[in-house]
């Protein structure tokens, strides 16, 4: 199963500008200093709007995963939920060779992939220490 094209809109432009340069952005609340997931329109702690963007460290911890089996003739894909070092949870593809070797709490890193010429660069997770080359 391959990653399909991902398109930006006005709400995601800053996020995808950052992923294109190898950076993952989170939402920051100037009112209470809380960090929220990138898709947040208001602060998850105080409900303030007017959030700004802050770069994430790229470190994460595996919370859960599943193996998705696509159409016949395609390779299965590992999809995961990871807790970012800054607190928010994010789900994405996990590029790991052996799903059987995964364990809750395993350290992960964010890597970036450009799945198609007409697609935005998207974040994926890789086991910490794995090559994080863009491709």
Regions found by a protein language model. Give the residues of each.
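OB-fold/S1-family single-stranded nucleic acid-binding modules
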Residues: 114-135
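Conserved hydrophobic positions within beta-strands
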Residues: 60-62, 94
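Short, conserved beta-turn/loop elements at beta-strand boundaries and strand-helix junctions
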Residues: 66-71, 114
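Short nucleic-acid-contacting surface segments enriched for D/E, G, S/T with interspersed K/R
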Residues: 96-109
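Short, cysteine/histidine-rich loop/knuckle motifs that typically chelate Zn2+
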Residues: 28-31, 42-48
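Short aromatic-glycine-enriched beta-strand elements
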Residues: 70-81, 119-122
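Short functional micro-motifs and their immediate structural scaffolds
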Residues: 37, 50-52
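Residues immediately within or flanking Cys/His clusters that coordinate Zn2+
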Residues: 23-26, 33, 39-40
